[in-house]
Amino acid sequence: MLLKLENSSKKIHNALQEDLQMVEATSCGGVVIYRGKILTLYKSYKNRYEGWVLPKGTVEEGEEYHETALREVKEEAGVQASIIKYVGKSQYSFNIQNDVVEKDVHWFLMSANSYHSRPQREEYCVDSGYYKFHEAYHLLKFSNERQILEMAYNEYLDLRKSNLWGNRKYF
């Protein structure tokens, strides 16, 4: 499933008119669940944005998407997680200096091994915690992350209903 922010095409159009360079980027992240609650992080980027987000980050050279997602969850939140399944891809764009970055984010449903989390200030994370679905949904800053959360949580509920949550891992 592909989710796209509504204003992405406007930004691309504006970039073409303003002679900005288009840059493509790929990130991966996780919807991490422990005992029905979802891990969220409070990020504070200087002069960019501040708010609650799902853990995600840039794919490093030679990395598979699932490896990036697991590494980013560990780096940003200090959480050891296991991938249950691939959820989908979201897209958004943003401006940096003379570039318009068009970003794809691949998302995975994950299971954590404990409630313990440790936000990493080096990753601009100043707080973290596990929240009930409706709390996490309303905390999240970005609509595309809310949509991914909804998809992932529905997958989680389906797996629980079938008594499969925690029994099968794809990676």
Task: For each feature predicted by the language model, list its residue ranges.
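Acidic, metal-coordinating catalytic segment for phosphate/diphosphate chemistry
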Residues: 2-29
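Charged phosphate-binding loop/patch that engages nucleotide di/tri-phosphates or the phosphate backbone
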Residues: 5-14, 138-171
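Entry beta-strands of beta-propeller and related beta-repeat scaffolds
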Residues: 37-38
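Short loop/turn segments immediately following the C-termini of beta-strands
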Residues: 43
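A conserved beta-turn-beta hairpin within the catalytic core of GNAT-like acetyltransferases
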Residues: 46-50
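Thr-Gly-centered strand-to-loop micro-motif
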Residues: 54-56
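Unchanged
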Residues: 59-147
